[in-house]
Swiss-Prot record:
GO terms for biological process: glucose metabolic process. Gene3D superfamilies: Insulin-like. SMART domains: IlGF. It comes from Torpedo marmorata. The gene is ins. Residues 33-49 form a propeptide. Heterodimer of a B chain and an A chain linked by two disulfide bonds. This is Insulin.
Length: 70
């Protein structure tokens, strides 16, 4: 599937689809490490703003969503 804008309930449904029984959280695992290497943290304010910025304001793929699974 191509990258797409996912917002609101569509984003939550996509996360349930991709993550299944593992569940999910809103801050990707690699973000803190990658951002610390870059010398800043985009997700300083935490949680949900990261995935909304990534997948709703911009586009993300199913592969991107996997980064938010537990």
């Amino acid at each position: 599937l191509p990258s797409q804008h996912l917002c609101g309930s569509h984003l939550v449904e996509a996360l349930y689809f991709v993550c299944g029984p593992k569940g999910f959280y809103y801050l990707p695992k690699a973000x803190x490490f990658v951002d610390s290497l870059a010398g800043y943290s985009k997700h300083q304010n935490g949680g949900i703003s990261g995935i909304v910025e990534h997948c709703c304001h911009n586009t993300c793929s199913l592969f991107d969503l996997e980064g938010y699974c537990n």
